[in-house]
Amino acid sequence: TDLLQRDVVLSKTSDPEEIVEFIIRDIDGKEATLQITISLDESAGDTEPIWYKDIVLDAQGVTNGKSFVSLADGTTLNLQDASNNQSLINLLYYFDNIDADENTISSPGANIDDSIISGLSGWTTRNTSRFISKSMSLDDFEAINSVIYLVDEYHTSGNRKAKNLKVGDTFSFKDEARNKFGMFRVYEINGQENGSVTISIVIQP
C-alpha cells in the first residue's frame, strides 16, 4: 500500500476549541474520516502581523503599470513580470467597465475578461483570494496588531472580487494559495482605466 503524506497548515481562531475534520477518498469512492480537536493555548500569545503600507497599483491602461501584488513580500509587478512569476501573484487591480464593477481588486483566479487583462485566463497558475467587506474606521484599521484578529474577521467564505471600491473601503481576505489571512484598506483612487489605487495591507506572516 502506498503511503500518502500531506502537510497541512491551519490558522487558529480565538475560539477555545475547534474541530477539524479530514476526509480521504480514493478513486474507488472509499473514504475514511478523521476528526481532531484543536485547543487554544492562551499562554502561547499572539503573533504580530506584517504591514505593507501605501502600495500603489496601476490600472490596466497604464503603460508598463504595476497592477499585481505578491503577498509574500508586498512586491508589485507589471503584467509581463507577473506572467513570468505566476505562483507569486495573489492580488491584482483593474478598472472594469464591462460588468460595472469599476475599481476592483481580485486575484488571478477570479473571472476577469481577457479584454481587461490580456492573457490572464491562460496562466497555468492562478492563485485565488476571497474578500469580505468590513465596516471599520481608519484608526481601528491602522491599530491592528494581532494575527488572531485577522483570522477571526474572516468568518465566512468570501467573494472572488472586491469591487466598486471607494476611498475608506476595508476588506478582510484569505490568500487561499498560502492559507494566510489579512485585511486591506483603500486610501486613494485616481482615474479609471489609466488610473491607480493606493492601499495598505496587513497580513499574517
Predicted feature locations:
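Conserved structural position at the C-terminal beta-strand
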Residues: 24-26
